[in-house]
Amino acid sequence: MERHVYERMAEIDRDHWWFVGRRRILTGLLERWRPRKDALKILEVGCGTGGNIAMLQQFGTVDAIEPDDYARAFAAERTGVEIKGGYLPDVPLKDAHYDLIVLLDVLEHIPDDRGALEALRPKLAPGGRLVLAVPAMPSLWSGHDVAHHHQRRYTKSTLEAVVKAAGFHTLRRTAFNTLLLPAIVGVRWLNKALGRKGGDEDRIPPAPVNGFLTWLFGAERHVAVRGLFPAGVSIALVAEPVLGSGSGISSDQGGRGPTL
């Protein structure tokens, strides 16, 4: 992404309703689908300005990768975590080391999404899991996606196909950012009709509005963790390596969590 996008992210990711609400949803998902209850070794790929690291540290120790120099320096200063630079598959990582690898709105930036997941698979310890969050609904493609250097938006089927091709078995897949979907669709289509680029989406609204949107979005965690939303602006997915894929254990070997 461009430098100004990271700078803007650094300004808003602590308080903006989308970032706060998403962290609440992902916290619920991790509480339900982490591979075990004790402290985990976690890798965040594409940590950006570090807004997710404190949330992830609730579940264990966190390593992180971020290729952008500005974002990496900002994240390291704000979190105290040593963050590796570079791009997959060239970043040196230990094999069979991590209990949890997360890519939170990152996979859509990577031209070879399957190749990236294949490179990460052997880095998971036995029983380890992969957690993804990605933008959904290709029909919502807009100037916002272009500004953020997205390669694609996913459907449930295209995301699962990439995950399967990379050697993973899906344990839970859920849409989220569902309650605000009608409003977001309306704004995106209005911006398209008026030729706007959609930059207002990265601004924090007035405090009462921001507070309400934070509450509404974050409240989805109770439904999203069960995979009950049929559609949404985003998709989250939890997966594990399949038998013979070179890492971890398959669902047939006891690594699968309860499926609701």
Per-region residue spans from a language model:
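Conserved N-terminal segment of class I S-adenosyl-L-methionine
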Residues: 1-96, 100-104, 115-117, 202, ...
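Short, glycine-/aromatic-enriched active-site segment of Class I SAM-dependent methyltransferases
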Residues: 10-11, 130-152, 156-164
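A short His-aromatic
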Residues: 105, 109
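A short glycine-rich, Lys/Arg-flanked "PGG" loop and its adjoining helix->strand segment in the class I
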Residues: 114-129
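Conserved S-adenosyl-L-methionine
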Residues: 168-178
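A C-terminal cap/extension of S-adenosyl-L-methionine-dependent methyltransferases
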Residues: 180-244
